[in-house]
Amino acid sequence: MLVLLITALFIPVSTQAGTVLQNAASNNATESNIDRAVPALNETKLTLMPGKKYTLVLENADGCSVSWKSGNTDIVTVSKKGRITAVADGKTTVVATVTVPVTENKTKSYKLKCKVVVETVKEARIAAIGDLLFHDRVIASGKKSDGTYNYDAIFKGTADYFKTFDVMIANQETPFIDDPAKYKGYPSFGTPTALGDAMIKAGINVVTTATNHSWDQRTRGIEVTVDYWKSHKDEAIMLGMHKTENTFQTIHYKKVNGIRIAFINFTTFLNDSSGIQPYYVNILKSNTYNEYGGYYGSLTEEKLFEKIKKAKSKADFVIVLPHWGIEYTHTPTSAQKKLAQKMADAGADAIIGCHPHVVMPMKIIDASDGRRVPCYYSLGNFVSNMSQAARNLEGIAELTITKWNGETTIKNAEFTPIINHLSGSETSYCVYLLSDYTDEMAARHSSNYLYGKGTITVKGMLDLFNSIGNETWK
């Protein structure tokens, strides 16, 4: 009987402020002269940015006395009227002690709690550049008198700009090789590892290697490329190539300013796949997206989408980096568009493509879950020995993403034109922002100076860039 009596004295009441215990005797008309609802707070959980204010409202508290207290005034302060001011990142609880008159001579107190999280908006700036395509003359441009190689000059016009980004992605079009006798350009490229040194020095920290040239130097090219980037894993993440089967399904993540970003890179084809192990390169198996025919591929469409979904479940933001499309055309194929839509629907938050050696437009895709996904179909080259005007007009994909209160969104997506400057004699190469380029510099571009084409001017390049049909992020 004692247990039953104690249970009867307290009745749980659910309110917005949580469950409180109300004295059952207060409902007794012989004892209570005041019939009222239980006090409650309008909010029991809040997330605020530092500096923001919010006023908690007491409900059912007319005629009651109230005192307010913050559990940690270094995180939030609270005024006598329940006005919260967020001070600094952290978690604490604001308590309102409400004293309610029950009878003329009796009161009851309630402690109403609101959990408060103060969180600064996290932000990450991401950029990507196109193909580092090392033709014979590009290789030769870095050779020094002592036989070593240095390619810092290529990045002289962009390195400072690159370092303003938290994530800087580049497409290493051609595999590394460690035998100088095999340093070569088209058609079976072999590139000095000195390029990697220059990339790191320029601020590049994510490198894609799944391209149509990945198998140009066969197994040794795979080994040297993977080993080089593995030895620099604290400075850059390499995507796309694998020495062993157990890393083939690996998804790479990078945490930047509290935002976890996933990266997935693949190519739709190889120039030649004879003798390759199925796990060496991320190659999409489906010929639906392979405009060049039935080349070897081990990454099925279903596995690709599963990989994107898995990345989405573990990351705040997913970037997919396909090597796809038709060379030397500014227009995405229907196959690219279909694949882009499917990748967006699977969870890709941004799609950044390479391979065509010319820029294709940035378009905004509406994903099936309502997200808006920027798709840069092609960034064009970054450095090459192609003298044609369109192949020297290039782009930087630029994204600013933010995370707050568990939600990651794209604040801005831009496409910035750049230009590959080939010296008149084609002995040196440097890439510039088009906004930093002048017609005086253009006059010394090999396309104009050596070949007399006169096709590269600042206005001409800008007009071409604006003509490809880029959409604007709003």
Name each model-derived stretch.
Residues 4, 18-120:
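Extracytoplasmic soluble-region selector
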Residues 8, 47-49, 59, 85, ...:
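Sterically constrained small-residue positions within well-ordered secondary structures
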Residues 95, 117-474:
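Acidic, metal/ion-coordinating pockets
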